[in-house]
């Protein structure tokens, strides 16, 4: 917060008042050249941005259109003229009258807020409340919404019932920031968006006030890297006294009146010094003694609290060239924190709301040290400089003042304490004026306070006319609490030290029970197609509960407008398919891309539409991100803060390096939050499912927790808490879980809805057909499903079907035989967990685990729990505690704690849970462990292979039936859970399923555009729907679409040439112009893959279709094939288009952004083992570097163009 102290400046007239060009509260004008009379200007809803001219002799004049009259404001340096329309929103008259100007008064009576004897009139309060609520909902772009109307009704009802109302937390944050933004006397308002708001409205005593203030000082000081902050104590309530801070600033130096009438210390603080002494303070006798605080709770006498020395950062003053300057013994404190002003928001008054920023150097060097009624060192310094002080024409005052200011700047910079010089501050204010003119049509400003006390006309603000008016929310002056009607109880109270307060907090059980609401709030957001990200987010929540007040939310449950009022956000997300957001993160991603950042004003179309260009690009350039990072590095506390100026964030991405866009969505969120002004606390964390994902998350989570604790000055035992959360000793304990019999379980479909949190539907099998030859050792099946016309199963060609399969019966029965305490076969059970109690809070209690609905154990293992995937290190750690054989216990512990050992074991064996139990037979397996610790059985996704126009009421997935042996082909036979089950189904069998739309993988609306389709193996699946749709267009609609080109690939023409007859029929009927097939294992023929066909036979066509005819290319298949095709297309475009390879990559990025290069990528297949092994080796290397500390978690994250996903 730049120079917030100027809002509550030291008493006394500001300097440089006589020759202003400002339009004051009464419209006063400078004497040199009278400003023109106000002209007609646009209405407030359509403010005009200022137009600057290159030189004063060629001024720019905005034409005043018809409308209400508004002040015309001129910049006399450049000649530009603007109209301040924002002033029309002012509801309060200034102190000036038509006959007199009071703009130079420091404390005009009209601008002071005095406590009224009774509550404010209800209608007056309601009017102010409505205005503020309207402002708030307009700021979040929800004006006129149902939530807006309901909030207005809620406020009206509360005022009618109680005579007042209360702000929501987001409303308070918005109001506090707006009050700073509206402060006419503050020159550093460009950073208004970075104000950190601490909500202390639950405070009930002076002791708690002191605790909050200590936290404020510690946070804001930040070891010298000052941060703007405000702490808001309870609002003024009718019939009750106020919370007040008697000191004008949280840190002030004492002023001792001497017998000869002089003052030792700061003369501005003589009165508060004497009050502190009256209330029990034992004074020193120095020039720079830090005053204690006098804090007052409602209807109580003030209490004295001494600030601990370690809390107050002070800077000894020295000069860069004048060595004698240090001997003067001067010093000043780092943190300017105004504490005697009132915050008004929507008619509500907060008499205690200390706020802090950082100093502008002239406030210390000119005002505090040189003013005659302050430390008055000017002549002493001049004498030391051998200046002639006998005559003013020697300019000794100016010379000495400059050197003192130089000493202040030098000393603060040497001590690494934030400070800003008056030239930088005023330049930033001019930028702020420009921003505000564009955003709001004006900016209230008091010229007499904005112009610094030295270098007046050398700064740009001197030449800028300003309009001064009062907006709400606002900071207002108020009478000192010991004077007049504000005085209440000045009895002497015993002083309390910081140590006493700290001890009281530690030992008070009742206080500890209410600590959580006072903690810094943190939002933990997750998005994933599975529950992995949710599980990690919940672990993160448990960790952050040690020192914060966290809430864990799915992205689709989170209102993105809340980001502007957040303090700390942690994101855990996966990436879906081709670098896209998971389905439950799509709305969050869209809203995030739409938000505007500090350097771009409003979102430009190329920024919020270019997600794929910026974060999924195959080239090595991202000009937008590079430009942003340059500006970010060059930015300072005189730059605009951005929409998310107060946000601190950390992001962790989940994914697989086998995919070309590894963690692309996580990188997008990480980059976008920074662009919008947020502060990254920790580099982007990335967890590779191919190796060490859980270990990577643990390391990142601990580092994120520690960084957050350091940032917010909480959790001194952060490292210990983080280690404790992930310690093996915190493993699953059977005594904390118990089973409870349930009357009746749910049907299957409602249970799946409960577990997967999405609508489910039941389709019925019509037929299952093997598409491969009977001579083939493999199987690929076409499953025809009857949707029975259910609306939720409607789809378009290119969409996916999600299917929820059961586990194999034999596997379930074998596992049940290993359970030590099986429940009766027909008894539905639930699991209850013992929740710990808290001192002064509720006692321990048994709480039902909501993860699974009540089912029999057999049903749970069959339909809901994953028993085929290799157990995670976390689960192995639990199993180690249940092993009776010491050697097995040791081996399980090793696997759970050694990432490389675990990954090698998992990769070689790929064991099911049953195989793990066979390897470690002494492990006991209690039922609660299975129901609470096993991962959930996830849906399997398949491309839809049909068109509803051709097969109404049907869905056709094409599925490769998976079967393989582990341990280099010598291990047990494993079966694909879903594919094997689908292959065994009979007509009439039910299939629980749902549709996942794939809007980026659909035929273009214009059928005249050429398309190239590339899909080997089951990659042909979505294209079957495409050709059926085109056949329908030709034969039912009479259209003549451009013939498509199909590139298919398989092993052998006689074994696995899928849909050959259908494709030939479609070609004969005009759907395809060309059909080319690549055979990788055709007898007596060389191996050929689809990318070979593209390179040797279709290069010219690929370039023509994509670059000249605005056509489309669709690629469907596994990640390795898709990557090879992408690289081939890039080389083709470079060769055929005569461009560099990077340029061709940029072209593909544009094609993706225009949705003309489409990819539908599915996971690893057996033939990608070599590639996957290489990727795992790379991931191991990176992971081990992290664990050794060679790659710390705190360096700048790689850009979105980093090679590898």
UniProtKB/Swiss-Prot annotation:
GO annotation, biological process: arginine catabolic process; negative regulation of blood pressure; nitric oxide biosynthetic process; nitric oxide mediated signal transduction; response to hormone; response to lipopolysaccharide; vasodilation
Domain FAD-binding FR-type per the UniProt entry, residue ranges: 758-1004
Bias-annotated ranges (Gly residues): 15-27
UniProt-annotated binding residues for FAD: 800, 940, 942-943, 958, 960, 964, 977-979
Ranges where the record places region Calmodulin-binding: 492-512
InterPro entries linked: CysJ-like_FAD-binding, FAD-bd_FR_type, Flavdoxin-like, Flavodoxin/NO_synth, Flavoprot_Pyr_Nucl_cyt_Rdtase, Flavoprotein-like_sf, FNR_nucleotide-bd, NADPH_Cyt_P450_Rdtase_alpha
Binding site for (6R)-L-erythro-5,6,7,8-tetrahydrobiopterin: 104, 448-449, 462
Record family assignment: Belongs to the NOS family.
Subunit and interaction comment: Homodimer. Interacts with NOSIP and NOSTRIN. Interacts with HSP90AB1. Forms a complex with ASL, ASS1 and SLC7A1; the complex regulates cell-autonomous L-arginine synthesis and citrulline recycling while channeling extracellular L-arginine to nitric oxide synthesis pathway.
Stated name of the protein: Nitric oxide synthase 3
């Amino acid at each position: 917060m730049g120079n917030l102290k100027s809002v509550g400046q030291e008493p006394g007239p500001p300097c440089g008042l006589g020759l202003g060009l400002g339009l004051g509260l009464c419209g006063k004008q400078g004497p040199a050249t009278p400003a023109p009379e106000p002209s007609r200007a646009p209405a407030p809803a359509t403010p005009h941005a200022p137009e600057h001219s290159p030189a004063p002799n060629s001024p720019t004049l905005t034409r005043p259109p018809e409308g209400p009259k508004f002040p015309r404001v001129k910049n006399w340096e450049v000649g530009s003229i603007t109209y301040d329309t924002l002033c029309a929103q002012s509801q309060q008259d200034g102190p000036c009258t038509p006959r007199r100007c009071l703009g130079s008064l420091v404390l005009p009576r009209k601008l002071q807020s005095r406590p009224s004897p009774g509550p404010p009139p209800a209608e007056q309060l309601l009017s102010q409340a409505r205005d503020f609520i309207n402002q708030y909902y307009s700021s979040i772009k929800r004006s006129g919404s149902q939530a807006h109307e309901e909030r207005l009704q809620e406020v009206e009802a509360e005022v009618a019932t109680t005579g007042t109302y209360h702000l929501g937390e987001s409303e308070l944050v918005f109001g506090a920031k707006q009050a700073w933004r509206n402060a006419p006397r503050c020159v550093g308002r460009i950073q208004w968006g970075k104000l950190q708001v601490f909500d202390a409205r639950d405070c009930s005593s002076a002791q708690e006030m002191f605790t909050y203030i200590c936290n404020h000082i510690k946070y804001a000081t930040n070891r010298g890297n000052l941060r703007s902050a405000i702490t808001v104590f309870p609002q003024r309530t009718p019939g009750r006294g106020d919370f007040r801070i008697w000191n004008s600033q949280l840190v002030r130096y004492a002023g001792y009146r001497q017998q000869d009438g002089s003052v030792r210390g700061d003369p501005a603080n003589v009165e508060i010094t004497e009050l502190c002494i009256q209330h029990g303070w034992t004074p020193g006798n120095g020039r720079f003694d830090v005053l204690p605080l006098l804090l007052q709770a409602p209807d109580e006498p003030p209490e004295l609290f001494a600030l601990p020395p370690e809390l107050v950062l002070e800077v000894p003053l020295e000069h860069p060239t004048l060595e004698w300057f240090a001997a003067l013994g001067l010093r000043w404190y780092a943190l300017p924190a105004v504490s005697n002003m009132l915050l008004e928001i929507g008619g509500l008054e907060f008499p205690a709301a200390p706020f802090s920023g950082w100093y502008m150097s002239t406030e210390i060097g000119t005002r505090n040290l040189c003013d005659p009624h302050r430390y008055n060192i000017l002549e002493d310094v001049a004498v030391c400089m051998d200046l002639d002080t006998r005559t003013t024409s020697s300019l000794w005052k100016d010379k000495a003042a400059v050197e003192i200011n130089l000493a202040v700047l030098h000393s603060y910079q040497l001590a690494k304490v934030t400070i800003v010089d008056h030239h930088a501050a005023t330049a930033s204010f001019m930028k702020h004026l420009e921003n505000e003119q564009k955003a709001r049509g004006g900016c209230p400003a008091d010229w007499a306070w904005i112009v610094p006390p030295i270098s007046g006309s050398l700064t740009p603000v001197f030449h800028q006319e300003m309009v001064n008016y009062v907006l709400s929310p606002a900071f207002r002056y108020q009478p000192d609490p010991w004077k007049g009607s504000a005085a209440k109880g000045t009895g002497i109270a015993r002083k309390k030290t910081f140590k006493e307060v700290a001890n009281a907090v530690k030992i008070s059980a009742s206080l500890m029970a209410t600590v959580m609401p006072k903690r810094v709030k943190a939002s933990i957001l997750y998005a994933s197609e599975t529950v992995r990200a949710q599980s990690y987010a919940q672990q993160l929540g448990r960790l952050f509960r040690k020192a914060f007040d966290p809430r864990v939310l799915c992205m689709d449950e989170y209102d993105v407008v809340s980001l502007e009022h957040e303090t700390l956000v942690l994101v855990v997300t996966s990436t879906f398919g081709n670098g896209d957001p998971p389905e439950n993160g799509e709305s969050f991603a869209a809203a995030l891309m739409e938000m505007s950042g500090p350097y771009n004003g409003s979102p430009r179309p190329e920024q919020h539409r270019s997600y794929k260009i910026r974060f999924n690009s195959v080239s090595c350039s991202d000009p937008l991100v590079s430009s942003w990072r340059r500006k970010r590095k060059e930015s300072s506390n005189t730059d605009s803060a951005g929409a998310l100026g107060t946000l601190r964030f950390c992001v962790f991405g989940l994914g697989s390096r086998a995919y070309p866009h590894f963690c692309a969505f996580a990188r997008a969120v990480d980059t976008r939050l920074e662009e919008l002004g947020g502060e990254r606390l920790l580099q982007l964390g990335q967890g590779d499912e191919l190796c060490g994902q859980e270990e990577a998350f643990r390391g990142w989570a601990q580092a994120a927790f520690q960084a957050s604790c350091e940032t917010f000055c909480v959790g001194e035992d952060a490292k210990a808490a983080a280690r404790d959360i992930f310690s093996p000793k915190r493993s699953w304990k059977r005594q904390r879980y118990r089973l409870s019999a349930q009357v009746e379980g749910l049907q299957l479909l409602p249970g799946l809805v409960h577990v997967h949190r999405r609508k489910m539907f039941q389709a019925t099998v019509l037929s299952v057909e093997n598409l491969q030859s009977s001579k083939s050792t493999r199987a690929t099946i076409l499953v025809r499903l009857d949707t029975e016309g259910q609306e939720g199963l409607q789809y378009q060609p290119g969409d996916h079907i999600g299917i929820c399969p059961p586990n194999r019966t034999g596997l379930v029965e074998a596992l049940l035989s290993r359970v030590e305490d099986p429940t009766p076969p027909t008894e539905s059970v639930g699991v209850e967990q013992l929740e710990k109690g808290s001192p002064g809070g509720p006692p321990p209690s048994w709480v039902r685990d909501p993860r699974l609905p009540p089912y029999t154990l057999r049903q749970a293992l069959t339909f809901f729990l994953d028993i085929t995937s290799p157990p995670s290190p976390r689960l192995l750690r639990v199993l180690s505690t249940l092993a009776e054989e010491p050697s097995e216990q040791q081996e399980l512990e090793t696997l759970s704690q050694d990432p490389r050992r675990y990954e090698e074991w998992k990769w070689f064996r790929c064991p099911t849970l049953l195989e793990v139990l066979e390897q470690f037979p002494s492990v006991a397996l209690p039922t609660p462990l299975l129901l609470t610790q096993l991962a959930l059985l996830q849906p399997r996704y398949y491309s839809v292979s049909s068109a509803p126009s051709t097969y109404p009421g049907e869905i056709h997935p094409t599925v490769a039936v998976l079967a393989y042996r582990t341990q280099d082909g010598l291990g047990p036979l494993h079966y694909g859970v879903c594919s094997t089950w689908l292959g065994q189904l009979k007509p009439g069998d039910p299939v629980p399923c749902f549709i996942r739309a794939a809007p980026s993988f659909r035929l273009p609306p214009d059928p005249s555009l050429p398309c190239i389709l590339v899909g080997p193996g089951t990659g042909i699946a979505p294209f079957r729907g495409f050709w059926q749709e085109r056949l329908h267009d030709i034969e039912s609609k009479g259209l003549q679409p451009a013939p498509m080109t199909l590139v298919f690939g398989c092993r052998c023409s006689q074994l696995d040439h899928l849909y050959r007859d259908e494709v030939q029929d479609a070609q004969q009927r005009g759907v395809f112009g060309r059909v080319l097939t690549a055979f990788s294992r055709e007898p007596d023929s060389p191996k050929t893959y689809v990318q070979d066909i593209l390179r040797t036979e279709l290069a010219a066509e690929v370039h023509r279709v994509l670059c000249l005819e605005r056509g489309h290319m669709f690629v469907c298949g596994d990640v390795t094939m898709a990557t090879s095709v992408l690289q081939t297309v890039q080389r083709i475009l470079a060769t055929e288009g005569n461009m560099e390879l990077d340029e061709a990559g940029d072209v593909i990025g544009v094609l993706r952004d225009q949705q003309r290069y489409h990819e539908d990528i599915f996971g690893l297949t057996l033939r990608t083992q070599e590639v996957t092994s290489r990727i795992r080796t790379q991931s191991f290397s990176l992971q081990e570097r992290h664990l050794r500390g060679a790659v710390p978690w705190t360096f700048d994250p790689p850009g979105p163009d980093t090679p590898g996903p």
